[in-house]
A protein has these predicted regions:
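Bacterial N-terminal signal peptides that target proteins for export
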Residues: 1-10
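Cleavable N-terminal signal peptides
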Residues: 10-12, 22
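N-terminal signal peptide c-region/cleavage motif recognized by signal peptidases
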Residues: 17-19
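Beta-strand-rich domain onsets/edges
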Residues: 21-39, 43, 61-62, 68, ...
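A short beta-turn/strand-edge loop motif at beta-sheet boundaries
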Residues: 46-51, 84
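Hydrophobic beta-strand segments
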Residues: 53-57
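Glycine-centered loop-to-beta-strand initiation motif
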Residues: 70-80
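Short, aromatic- and glycine-rich surface loops/edge beta-strands on solvent-exposed regions
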Residues: 85-98
Length: 115
């Protein structure tokens, strides 16, 4: 093969592989709530849990309430009695190179606390 064919094949391979690499690094954040706590889960789009990240919990006015390290299984639990959740919560997960967030509304908390 001549150099042009080799370069064309290499470029085609790069164009095919590049979107897969970018997709593998998307950060997915989910939070569920019950009457006692918010459970935060963070993983990459390939399903691997985030193993190192800071989880910031902010109130409805965007004031920082607490920062917690994520567990190696990609989760962290925030006890509701440790934060002012009257106006909802903004949960931010930051791995250092990727970040994303989840909003927990007052209605989410109230709905899950009904007996």
């Amino acid at each position: 093969m001549d150099g042009t064919v080799i370069r064309s094949a290499a470029l085609a391979s790069l164009l095919i592989a590049a979107p897969m690499v970018a997709e593998a690094h998307q950060l997915v954040v989910f939070a569920s709530v019950d009457c006692e706590a918010v459970t935060v889960e963070a993983k990459f789009s390939n399903g691997n849990p985030v193993q190192q990240a800071d989880v910031r919990v902010l109130d409805g006015q965007n004031a920082l309430l607490v920062t917690l390290p994520i567990e190696t299984d990609g989760t962290v639990t925030v006890p509701l009695d440790s934060v002012d959740h009257s106006e909802g919560l903004l949960i931010e997960v930051d791995t250092g190179s990727h970040d994303n967030y989840w909003i927990v509304t007052p209605d989410d908390i109230a709905r899950n606390c009904q007996s």
